[in-house]
Amino acid sequence: MDEKDLATQPEEAGQDPRLPGPHEDPRRQEGVEAEKAEGPLAPHPQGERLSQPPPAAGGKLLSLKGDRAFQRLRQGRMGRGRFLNVKWLPASELRVGIVVSKKVGKAVVRNRIKRRLREILRRLHLPKAHLLVIASPEAREATYAELFQDLIRALKKSGLIQ
């Protein structure tokens, strides 16, 4: 290594001599400003959005926890659908438990069903209750739309929604 390779003057804070400045990049087009990102739904380079904004109901669902909560739900009101069964009891806040047994499939399949159900439940404006959703093995083949319709049907049969 030669002495000419070593910096003789101290570098100013925040400047790295190895990187070009914002207007020194030869690949940057003149007169083009970077688009401002707007949270998780930043515009795609071609202009369209990558996904739809979440509904007003949005937010993370609270989970049912503990054996006692699940045991209490055995006495709750029940509704059956083709792919799902639901049980619920009135409560001070909405809490959801999702059960997908190993009969449904391997972990990847079970987790996909749980993700879909959580998203459906998040989008619905449900009243305050403790809700248990149990997926049957037939749910393995169901699409998102089929799960959505079946959950609505089961919730109506149980009396949680009109």
UniProtKB/Swiss-Prot annotation:
What molecular function terms (GO) are annotated for this protein?
3'-tRNA processing endoribonuclease activity; ribonuclease P activity; tRNA binding
Residue spans with biased composition (Basic and acidic residues)?
A: 21-38
What EC number(s) are associated with this protein in UniProt? 3.1.26.5
Q: Is 4Fe-4S a UniProt keyword of this protein?
A: no
Q: Does the keyword tRNA processing apply?
A: yes
What keywords is this UniProt entry annotated with?
A: Endonuclease, Hydrolase, Nuclease, RNA-binding, tRNA processing
An example of a Gene Ontology cellular component annotation for this protein is: ribonuclease P complex
GO biological process terms, alphabetically, are: tRNA 5'-leader removal
Which PROSITE patterns did the record assign?
A: RIBONUCLEASE_P
Q: Give positions of region: Disordered.
A: 1-63
Pfam families to which the protein is assigned, alphabetical:
Ribonuclease_P
Write out the catalysed reaction.
Answer: Endonucleolytic cleavage of RNA, removing 5'-extranucleotides from tRNA precursor
Superkingdom assignment: Bacteria
Assembly information from the UniProt record = Consists of a catalytic RNA component (M1 or rnpB) and a protein subunit.
Q: Which HAMAP family match?
A: RNase_P
Reported function: RNaseP catalyzes the removal of the 5'-leader sequence from pre-tRNA to produce the mature 5'-terminus. It can also cleave other RNA substrates such as 4.5S RNA. The protein component plays an auxiliary but essential role in vivo by binding to the 5'-leader sequence and broadening the substrate specificity of the ribozyme.
List other remarks: The open reading frame (ORF) for this protein entirely encompasses the ORF for the 50S ribosomal protein L34 (rpmH). The two start codons are separated by four nucleotides.
- Protein family membership: Belongs to the RnpA family.
Q: What is this protein called?
A: Ribonuclease P protein component
Q: Give me the gene this protein comes from.
A: rnpA
